[in-house]
Design a protein with these regions (language model features):
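Accessory RNA 3′-end/elbow-binding domains used by RNA modification enzymes
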Residues: 1-49, 121, 138, 161, ...
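RNA pseudouridine synthases
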Residues: 1-185
Length: 307
């Protein structure tokens, strides 16, 4: 019997392998928020994608249970933030906009003293910076950037470039990979939805919050495989050409998603595209035995050959 397709999974199945697009409140750490999600849903494991400092709010995707296997494919996704930059002295608006534009492209940053990681110089890319509004010495801007970019440090450097000094007043993450603010849920929403499911047997609110893990992996090139190849992949076998239904245009050594014809994620892999091997499995996402077994182990083959 095959897995239900992603959109038809039961609540229990979503709790086992789902993702929540959570609106992180100001105050707690990202780790604390993930721990609260575990307690609310009475599950054993939850992990977050991309760490937000305690005062920062916004998009914090939470992976549930088996979905945490996918975290390695998600931590380096591009991010977008909306930030309030406070200038320490008044600067003409055109100059502020010109200086901000100069920060697009590749930057070299050392994490700020308040960060939770080692303060080693890192290279990061700013994709775009757009000024949204200005009130006095407060500048509201939107920035799209590579994962691991420190917006606090960006604000400091902008102030230095302007010659007046500046700091980050407020920060909110508005995008993390395929997740944005269009379908955010709060911890309060999650608590209420779980209560409705347990007490009133109404699963609609919880189903509206927990998405299939495939939603988090929608950015990856998708290889579609035959049902006969699924269980072998679930046991860690390499994906060979005969097992492939559809192959996207990918480069070698690229991270890919390996899917069934029903759009269920089977595994994450690295494209090989050589010697009849299409991809090497990096992380199995589907439980073995979900699909019928069509392959034979080396031990069984040797036994049959010797019979």
């Amino acid at each position: 019997m095959t897995n239900p397709v992603a959109q038809q999974r039961t609540i229990d199945e979503l709790l086992q392998k789902g993702v929540i697009n959570l609106d992180k409140p100001a105050g707690p750490t990202s780790h604390e928020v993930a721990a609260w999600v575990k307690r609310i849903l009475h599950i054993k494991k939850a992990g977050h994608i991309g760490t937000l400092d305690p005062k920062v709010t916004g998009v914090l995707p939470i992976l549930l249970q088996d979905a945490t296997r996918a975290v390695g494919a998600l931590v380096n996704l591009p991010k977008e933030y909306v930030c309030v930059l406070h200038l320490h002295k008044t600067v003409p608006d055109p100059l502020v906009r010109d200086i901000l534009r100069e920060f697009t492209g590749v930057l070299y940053q050392r994490p700020p003293l308040k960060s939770a990681v080692r303060r080693q110089i890192r290279k990061r890319e700013i994709y775009y910076i757009d000024v949204l509004e200005r009130q006095g010495n407060d500048v509201l801007f939107k920035v799209g950037c590579e994962a691991g970019t420190y917006i606090r440090k960006l604000c400091h450097d902008v102030g230095e470039a302007l010659g007046v000094g500046a700091h980050m007043q407020e920060l909110r993450r508005t995008k993390a990979g395929p997740f944005d603010e269009s379908k955010l849920s709060t911890l309060h929403d999650l608590t209420d939805a779980y209560h409705f499911w347990i007490e009133d047997h109404d699963e609609a609110p919880l189903r509206d919050i927990i998405m299939p893990v495939e939603r988090a992996l929608s950015h990856l090139p998708k290889i579609i495989i035959r049902d006969t190849a699924v269980d072998a992949i679930c046991h860690g076998a390499q994906l060979a050409e005969p097992g492939v239904i559809s192959l996207p245009d990918v480069d070698r050594k690229q991270l890919v998603g390996i899917y069934t014809a029903r759009d269920e994620i089977v595994a994450l892999g690295i494209s090989v595209l050589q010697g009849g091997v299409i991809a090497k499995v990096k992380r199995v996402m589907m439980e073995p035995g979900t699909y019928p077994r069509y392959w034979k182990s080396r031990k069984i083959r040797k036994h049959e050959e010797g019979a």
